[in-house]
Amino acid sequence: MNKGLIGKKLGMTQIFAEDGRRIAVTVVEAGPCVVVQKKSVAKDGYSAIQVGLGAKDASRANAAQIGHCKGAGAGVFTHYRELRMDNTDAYNLGDVIEAAVFEEGDLVDVTGTSIGKGFAGVIKRWGFKGGRSSHGSRFHRAPGSIGCSATPSRVFKNKKMPGQLGNEKVTVQRLKVVRVDAADNLILLGGAIPGSANGVVLIKDSVKAKK
């Protein structure tokens, strides 16, 4: 993976292809991002760059943040993400990465935070079937038995149970770049991506693009 940047999800719309097909797309305001750090195999054990998005008032940043971004010479940022690279020689501190880094037809992976839906039961959270609604049934939406008694006398880890639904890191793979508006730093991606409007997402080359 050698391309990527941070963006902000604006919402979904639809466009028409040249053959008349209607395509649902997600509009992402991609960048401009600034390279604030480079990592090398010799020093850090892997090769990567760190990019920042969204200017932040220096008076609201601590000394560590200011010092971290000093080498880039572009101020302090609100959001930071790291991009693994095969080779970082093409990037220098302070370089600006914009939407034009991607082209129409590219396949990308998009990572974001899914919409939080609060505490949910097993039917909504995991898709359990549930029990009968009538005929004397006293079992409707409960999870039922969650383990054995004497052996093993415990509940196994990762048991599907009620709990927090959403608000977790989600990656959608192999989305197609339908259109790129370099003037306004907009990227139109085919399909849906995680998160709500104005949510921060990471767009990078698809790891399965060549498969």
From Swiss-Prot:
Superkingdom in the source lineage: Bacteria
Enumerate the InterPro entries for this protein.
Ribosomal_uL3, Ribosomal_uL3_bac/org-type, Ribosomal_uL3_CS, Transl_B-barrel_sf
Which Pfam family name is an example for this entry?
A: Ribosomal_L3
- Alphabetized HAMAP family for the sequence: Ribosomal_uL3_B
Q: Name one GO molecular function term.
A: rRNA binding
Tell me the organism: Geobacter sp. (strain M21)
Keywords attached to this entry: Ribonucleoprotein, Ribosomal protein, RNA-binding, rRNA-binding
Sum up the protein's function in the record's words: One of the primary rRNA binding proteins, it binds directly near the 3'-end of the 23S rRNA, where it nucleates assembly of the 50S subunit.
User: Which classification does the entry list for the species?
Assistant: Bacteria, Pseudomonadati, Thermodesulfobacteriota, Desulfuromonadia, Geobacterales
Protein name (database record) = Large ribosomal subunit protein uL3
Q: What is one cellular component GO term in this UniProt entry?
A: cytosolic large ribosomal subunit
Gene Ontology terms: biological process: translation
Q: How would you summarize the oligomeric state and partners of this protein?
A: Part of the 50S ribosomal subunit. Forms a cluster with proteins L14 and L19.
- Which family does this protein fall into? Belongs to the universal ribosomal protein uL3 family.
